[in-house]
């Protein structure tokens, strides 16, 4: 893989790339509101659960499946699965709108023909089309996923900048295990068992006061 491909991936997953990731908390705001996430320790537990049983794990597997698929039909099936797997309306909106924004921006800059796809499926498909290595794509996608939630945690909790980075760094071993599972997994390995996160995202839809869209 060339350094140009690496730089392209870095740009795609940069906070400056206009997908609107900053507006979504993946249900974290609901969890904070209900007292499930209260401080740095409980935030770390929440992120670990997402990597092991929740949205981070399923996103990684969907990304890898999209990367490996060779036909438009199978890509569409993976994207349909990604949509069906969303546990709430806001989580569907989160992946749908970010994916659509990613596809529009990437097509406009690199003239890469991309249908409107959910976010992890779009990133996986774009990485394949641009010869970006799958393992690096998975590592950087999950790091960006976690970074966005840590940043959300800083806005929702009494969490300083240094501790926030310590919490993010501590996710490294579990992140790598999640990547390894995605590299060896298939769509049949897709599951979700992060029920607290799913319920938090559902309850967030009717939360009275909020700053995030999910």
UniProtKB/Swiss-Prot annotation:
Reading the lineage from the top rank, the first entry is: Bacteria
Q: Which family does it belong to?
A: Belongs to the UreF family.
Q: Which GO terms describe its cellular component?
A: cytoplasm
Fetch the PANTHER family from UniProt: UREASE ACCESSORY PROTEIN F
- Keywords of the record: Chaperone, Cytoplasm, Nickel insertion
Task: Report the principal subcellular site.
Answer: cytoplasm
> What organism is this sequence from?
Ruegeria sp. (strain TM1040) (Silicibacter sp.)
- Fetch the InterPro entries from UniProt: UreF, UreF_sf
Q: How does it assemble?
A: UreD, UreF and UreG form a complex that acts as a GTP-hydrolysis-dependent molecular chaperone, activating the urease apoprotein by helping to assemble the nickel containing metallocenter of UreC. The UreE protein probably delivers the nickel.
- Protein name in UniProt: Urease accessory protein UreF
Give a short account of what the protein does: Required for maturation of urease via the functional incorporation of the urease nickel metallocenter.
The molecular function terms in GO held by this entry are: nickel cation binding
